[in-house]
UniProtKB/Swiss-Prot annotation:
The keyword Isomerase does not apply. NCBIfam families: guaA_Nterm, PRK00758.1. InterPro entries: Class_I_gatase-like, GATASE, GMP_synth_GATase, GMP_synthase_A. It comes from Methanococcus maripaludis (strain C5 / ATCC BAA-1333). It holds the Pfam family GATase. The lineage of its organism: Archaea, Methanobacteriati, Methanobacteriota, Methanomada group, Methanococci. One of its GO terms (molecular function) is ATP binding. Gene3D superfamilies: 3.40.50.880. Signal peptide: none annotated. This is GMP synthase [glutamine-hydrolyzing] subunit A. SUPFAM superfamilies: Class I glutamine amidotransferase-like.
């Protein structure tokens, strides 16, 4: 099972539904849930930090990003929280948008395996990661944001500024499936 920490984003149920379409069991839990409570359930194989409107209300997400040995995927606000937890900089976007944008994948990697080097995604840019921590690398960027996706250099921790769970994002299901593979789920190809 994958747990989705609910940071109050409008697409949190869409994340769960997208995982259901992939036949991956998922459960939405409050963002006040501790890492200890999560790892006490041996069926949990991965964690998604959802988007949301307010970084100050994302209670335990930074601690989970720092200390989880389970794979973690941060979406939108979740992506920002991961970066912030490791010492990255998050601030207002230069171009505040909520729109369809072109994403450019720097090179094929485990999160974007099977995804073309350029695709369209639905993204929210009110706040964004401005500087990544030293232990992360940039996986993808756009014309309006130089850091659309990141990965920890040693752990299975990923962040995406855009929303792979919505139908407007091309290959969003592939990106989510790739994360689920990192969590140990297998799929017929």
């Amino acid at each position: 099972m994958i747990v989705i920490l609910n940071n109050g984003g409008q697409y949190v149920h869409r994340i769960q539904r997208s995982l259901k379409y992939l036949d991956v069991p998922a459960k939405i839990i409050p963002n006040s849930t501790t890492l200890e409570e999560i790892i006490a359930d041996s069926e949990i194989k991965g964690i998604i930090l959802s988007g949301g409107p307010d970084i100050t209300k994302a209670t335990n997400c930074e601690n989970i990003a720092l200390n989880s040995e389970l794979p973690v995927l941060g979406i939108c606000l979740g992506h920002q929280l991961i970066s912030k937890a490791y010492g990255g900089e998050v601030s207002r976007a230069d171009s505040e948008e909520y729109a369809s944008i072109k994403i450019y994948v720097k090179e094929e990697n485990d999160l974007f395996n099977g995804v073309p080097s350029e695709f369209t995604a639905w993204a929210s840019h009110m706040d964004e990661v401005k500087v990544i921590p030293d232990c992360f690398e940039v996986l993808a960027y756009s014309d309006i944001c130089g850091i659309e996706s990141i990965k920890h250099k040693e752990k299975s921790i990923y962040g995406v500024q855009f929303h792979p769970e919505v139908s407007h994002t091309e290959y969003g299901d592939v990106i989510l499936k790739n994360f689920c593979k990192k969590c140990g789920f297998e799929f017929e190809e």
